[in-house]
Amino acid sequence: FYKSKNHFSLMASHDRLAHVMSQIKILAGALFKISNDIKILSSGPRSGIYELIIPQNEPGSSIMPGKVNPTQCESLSMVCTQIMGFEYAVSIANASGTLQMNEYKPLIGFNILTSIRLLSNAISNFRLKLVEGIKANPKTIKKNLENSLMLVTALVPKIGYEKAAEIANLAFDESINLKEATIKLGYLNANDFDEAINTNEMI
């Protein structure tokens, strides 16, 4: 810490504190997205994506037996939402000073310190109760990848856009994968298809 060279500036405005709060909000925004992505990727097991398997921290849903609720994702996203609200309050407080005096520092300080504490606790719980126990679901990932119609894009250089679109439409209409649709239409044999769509080399 050091003494300011311009006391009037710091009494009239708390820009630096507002900047600190904005950085906390940016972190909260990133964590909010991460928690929502995990929640979507772990949805299932039959009607969702189910490419991630999350720990079962609670007995399950009180309504649906056997259901695994993404409680840690929900908890973290609620904390992040609260912090976004705190940041908005800080920005209003920082803009609300009167001439050479901003009397909103107690609100600003409270929101910053509370946000740090809330986010720190939420991150710790998220790591211990979800991240360390999360697992990939290779079987479902492979199934979803093989059934993805978007892979048809890789066939365009070989057979052209129109034929590739025809393959995608047939695969969708008959609930078959792209390889089966391609062979059925006679545009490529199995070996040529595997050479064109090699998912191991697409990343």
Where are the regions a protein language model picked out?
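Conserved, well-structured ligand/cofactor-binding cores
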Residues: 1-203
